[in-house]
Amino acid sequence: MTILVTGGAGYIGSHTCIELLSAGHDIVVVDNLCNSSKKAIDAVKKVSGKDFPFYVCDILDRDALSSVFDKHKIDAVIHFAGLKAVGESVEKPLEYYHNNMTGTFTLLDVMRSHGVFSIVFSSSATVYGSPKTVPIKEDFPLSTTNPYGTTKLMLERVLTDVQFADKRFSVVLLRYFNPIGAHKSGTLGEDPKGIPNNLLPYVAQVAVGRLEKVHVFGDKYPTKDGTGVRDYIHVVDLALGHVKAVEKKAGNPGVYIYNLGTGHGYSVIEIIKAFSKACGKELPYVIDPPRAGDIAV
């Protein structure tokens, strides 16, 4: 298959590109590079030993996106492109709703006009809000605690409605937890612009001296040590999940929903202690107030 990967220069997107190429698929990548870098694309080409088309393209730009579809016979789309920081979404809700929602509307419109009806959507476990029990199953009640999560939940509904109206569509909704890790080659990993939003790259930057200490947001949650607990899944496992989803469901009309995680959570303090042990030195941290939109588990 030839698969369009939106947001393919991002952390999860770039690792998925490698696994798609390894599985024998052709890829076309678009990314506006607002929170990623072309270095990731170069790394994918180096690791895979394969070349592929890459376009600096914003999915909000219908003409530019349509031009990509005109140039390539796309069989399916894996859709990562979007703004993704929980805290920032609370501060900039309008930007998140506009970018994530309108961008996906534009993508779906262009897909339909070019006869492409298979999409794997990068959703999130944030659509479950603050669950009463864990581990979380796909049939749990849905709710959100921040604008980022709300965009994911709303887009799940949009995609479901689109498939209900047009039975040619195959929609896979992948609700995943917290990706961590890097490609075994060491040439590709999570490399955020500016201060990291995710825990692992933040801890890593403290370990190498780029940042002074880890900021732990909240220690009064109803968890084992009072800090937030998250399910961490290796990014390559997550990437392989996307490959399997597009291989199994592309061309099979319907809506398919899958959680992607390990089923086991670790607290922020546990992560810091484990990282400290691995690097052979204690990493300093400070307790800060909880961030708006964060949950315990």
Where would I find each of the regions flagged by the language model?
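C-terminal substrate-binding subdomain of Rossmann-fold SDR/epimerase-dehydratase oxidoreductases
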Residues: 208-297
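N-terminal Rossmann-like NAD(P)+-binding domain of SDR-like oxidoreductases, especially those catalyzing
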Residues: 1-182
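Glycine-rich "substrate-gating" loop/helix at the edge of Rossmann-like oxidoreductase active sites
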Residues: 145, 180-196, 204-205, 220-236, ...
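Short alpha-helical functional segments enriched in proximate histidine and acidic residues
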Residues: 19, 23, 110, 206, ...
